[in-house]
């Protein structure tokens, strides 16, 4: 199971630009910057796709506010989940790893 979540990064470039772009992937709408600028870098593209899924999740959570009664709760839990997963993604970039985030990794495979 751990092999499916943690991918090896032996052949990733060690440039500072790659890690900066990968870090931008988890900062909301800034996920589009590495997605459009670094399509040839596999390490950055992996993190950008995960950041895109997290951003789409946060946008969908905003629409949940329009639901009566449970909208605020759904938005709160979704926002908390996105925040925790974004911090986990930033930690994986800081550790120079490619870690499939839980639940997000499934949707990234569909992109």
From Swiss-Prot:
Disruption phenotype: Deletion of the probable mamGFDC operon leads to a slight reduction in magnetic response and slightly narrower magnetite crystals. Residues 1-17, 72 are cytoplasmic. Probably subject to cleavage or degradation. It is found in: Magnetosome membrane. It is a multi-pass membrane protein. GO terms for cellular component: magnetosome membrane. Residues 39-50, 94-111 are lumenal. Keywords: Biomineralization, Magnetosome, Membrane, Transmembrane, Transmembrane helix. The chain crosses the membrane at residues 18-38, 51-71, 73-93. Belongs to the magnetosome MamF/MmsF protein family. This bacteria makes up to 20 cubo-octahedral magnetosomes of about 45 nm in diameter which contain membrane-bound crystals of magnetite (Fe(3)O(4)). Plays a role in regulating magnetite crystal size; partially redundant function with MmsF. This is Magnetosome protein MamF.
